[in-house]
């Protein structure tokens, strides 16, 4: 069970939190029309200034900027965990597991596209350094079976080993995604139960439940907005967590026909009312 005498780490975490991008920052970023403008704002006005200090913002492209920002936030997390050896507590490996799942899914996408030889260019060494398997070997993968061979000694192997290709030789990335994310959600819950106790455990389980519940609300909206997906289609991409939205309202939400209808129904939920309280512009959206 975790020792709660991590006051120095708590103070450091609060410092990181204080440096986060605020609402005004996001409003300013939304006004930008090019990647160089976004990079320049981040360089001049946010805590990313140091990691962007040697970057020519006038010529930076989106992929490179994303990699720099992702690496910086990941390294901040690693430094925080190393500070008082939180990395020795299993729960704090959650971010590494999430990264591994993301990389595995991306590898399958490249296999489906027939461009697996290019996948090596997308693997970030800073992620590979903290992986539970030899992530750089994924650059040698050419087939799904090659991927399984590398994952054989990991929990991921048994989760995805029985997947079959369709008539075009492609693997169902959506189905694999939800299988791996289901594993991830359950892993986080079990780690919380194992490493925390009492009110802290209760609060952590509640917080993570809300986080995944909101992810479902957001992802369902995206599917509704961009593809007009129905409930049956959306149900396959949802995290397996109870919702704070009533069953009746949740069913109504998932069976809306448009993104506008979705927002109208969402306004009548606890999440929607909270969103309106935080941002009155939402009440006018539909």
Put a short name on every predicted segment.
Residues 1-286:
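N-terminal domain-start signal
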């Amino acid at each position: 069970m975790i020792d709660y005498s991590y006051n120095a780490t708590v103070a450091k975490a609060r410092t990181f939190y204080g440096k986060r991008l605020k609402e005004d920052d996001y409003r300013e970023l939304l006004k930008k029309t090019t990647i160089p403008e976004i990079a320049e704002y981040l360089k001049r006005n946010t805590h990313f200034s140091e990691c962007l200090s040697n970057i020519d913002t006038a010529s930076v492209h989106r992929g490179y900027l994303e990699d720099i920002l992702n690496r910086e936030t990941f390294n901040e997390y690693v430094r925080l965990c190393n500070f008082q050896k939180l990395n020795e507590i299993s729960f704090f490996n959650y971010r590494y597991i999430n990264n591994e799942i993301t990389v595995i899914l991306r590898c399958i996408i490249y296999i489906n596209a027939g461009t697996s030889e290019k996948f090596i260019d997308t693997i970030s060494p800073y992620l590979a350094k903290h992986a539970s398997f030899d992530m750089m070997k994924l650059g040698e993968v050419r087939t799904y079976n090659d991927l399984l061979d590398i994952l054989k000694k990991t929990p991921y192997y048994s989760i995805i080993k029985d997947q079959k290709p369709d008539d075009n030789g492609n693997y169902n990335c959506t189905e694999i995604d939800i299988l791996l994310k289901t594993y991830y959600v359950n892993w986080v819950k079990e780690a919380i139960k194992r490493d925390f106790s009492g009110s802290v455990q209760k609060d952590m389980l509640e917080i993570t439940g809300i986080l995944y519940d909101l992810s479902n609300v957001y992802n369902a909206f995206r599917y509704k907005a961009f593809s007009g997906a129905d409930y049956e289609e959306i149900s396959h991409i949802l995290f397996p967590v109870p919702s704070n939205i009533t069953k009746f309202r949740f069913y109504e939400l998932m069976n809306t026909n448009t993104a506008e209808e979705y927002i109208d129904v969402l306004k009548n939920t606890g999440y929607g009312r909270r969103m309106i309280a935080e941002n009155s512009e939402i009440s006018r959206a539909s």
